[in-house]
Amino acid sequence: MKKFLACMMAFALMLSCVSCFAEGESVPAKIDMTKWQYEAADDVYWQVGLSYAATPADSSYETMGIFVPGAYFTAADNGDGTYTCTVNESGTVGQYTAVTAPLIIPVNTPGYSAMAAPTGYSSSMGYGSISDYTSEGIIVLFAGARGRDAGAPAGVTDFKAAIRYARYNKDLLPGDMDSIFSLGMSGGGAQSALIGASGNSDLYTPYLAAIGAVMTESDAVKGSMCWCPITNLDIADEAYEWNMGNTRSGLSEEEQAYSDGMALAFAEYINGLGLTDENGTALVLAESEEGIWQSGTYYDYVKDVIETSLEHFLSDTEFPYTAASSGGFGGRGGRGGMRGGNFGGTEGGFAGPGNGEIPDFGNGEKPDFANGEMPDFGGENAEQETAYEEMDGITRAESTSSALSLSGTYETKQDYIAALNANGEWVTWDEETNTVTITSVAAFTQALKNASKGIAAFEQLDRGQGENTLFGYGDGNGAHFDAILAELVQGSEYETAFAEDLAKQDALGNTVDVRLNMYNPMYYLSPAYEGYQTSEPAACWRIRTGINQGDTALCTEIDLALAAEAYAEGTQVDFETVWGQGHTEAERTGSSTANFIAWVQECMK
């Protein structure tokens, strides 16, 4: 009898929940399974214009397309160009069935730009073609999303809503809904990292509710692929100066003070972050005779990562070798990995040329990828780099070339090392053991990784950087968000503007510190933050970066990788840096698309 009553109560509760769901906020309509279209050349069934938000903030962006391998459906031709489809559970493509197939959601948002949803069958989705994935048995969720002009957390909110919508239709769609993977580059890599770190975070609940997202499904993902993620924005300015401040010249006394002050703040941040290496060694910074806190186990880790990156390049590259360009170093070649660890790194640091003491002193247009047609960056990496920097609307210096310029053909590895040392020896290489040693992280950045952004890199004092717009308030105007920089500018002409912006509230009553936490994967992954263990992070991570990019500090990716690795036992982190590449879909060998697909396959085993 008690069991019967318990069952009846559970049934009544379920009916009550269904009633509340129906009578409360509206929800998106489910997929109409009679409206599928078919691309015979690729054997793909697809639908576009699917609204994942019942009350969208911007309906021109907040729809999605779904692209399904043909074998996963049994289809009946409706005679009007559409098909009625049901899941064919025995359908198989590659190593997957209609039941076990993973799903991917591309995040093609350079500079945190908006991403238009597809309006038809798109051969390209920004990271290779649709058929690159469907031919391997992978289902593609191609969602539009608002961009930086709408203000954080609009973009990630939209991608979360799209993921929830796919799961809302799990009774109709093929695929393993527990195996969704995000992928992105640059600002897209950052938002992919956020999707991976912030699964089911309560901070997003009011924003999801505001657009009428499905509130009964999860937005957590299994894996996150991040190329050159521009993230960890609460400390990004400070990391940039610690890493590349030594490459600046011609700074005023005030500018030098800001650079040095931010570098010092980064050292304090690292020493409170609690990072450890794969052996459990605490990674910290210490004061140094030269530079600003250029010593300690964290510094040694960074230095080792740079050395390993060059070692990988030398082992991977066939000589004679022709450098791809005169700016920077190398071309398509190896990316680094940490010696002895299961993921490598790239990070570095040297602040401004000062002594660590702070002196006493009193916007581009967002890209809009019309009609859902994404540029295909699956070709040569040099082309990718140019494309991203032209499209992302981020302010950079007119000249970003490093002090050392490599071009032409190098007959031997010894010739290449000699070219690296053309302006003074800072690299030695033991040919027998393929062991590289550099004199310092500062020598590396001075030679090959110059700052390409002004002070501060992500938080321009005139509010003109793309990230300023990201933390604006939906009107396309920039706002200040860096609380550390706000302290450094006290007593200057910028003090009032910083104070006013940091106190503003968005439409849901949140100040920028809350929104900054929502857009910081470390907030969820690191025990140093209040958001630790308040989300369901991804179990699989793949992070790649071009080691010579001037777009963000090397610390960005390594801190993310270390925090993700330490979050939970069994978390898989595949992290490497790529020698000779910059701000691009950097890969040590092979193509970014093929390598991503292979990684997904490994995660699914």
Where are these regions (language model features)?
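Sec-dependent signal peptide cleavage junction
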Residues: 14-24
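Disordered, low-complexity segments in secreted/periplasmic proteins that are enriched in proline
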Residues: 23-24, 325-398, 463
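Catalytic-loop region of hydrolases
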Residues: 23-95
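Short beta-strand element of the alpha/beta-hydrolase
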Residues: 64, 80-86, 96-112, 116, ...
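Short amphipathic alpha-helix adjacent to the substrate-entry channel of hydrolases
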Residues: 120-140
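Alpha/beta-hydrolase active-site loop
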Residues: 151-172, 594-598
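Primarily recognizes the serine-hydrolase "nucleophile elbow" in alpha/beta-hydrolase
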Residues: 168-247, 325, 330-340
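C-terminal subdomain of alpha/beta-hydrolase-fold enzymes, centered on the catalytic histidine
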Residues: 372-604
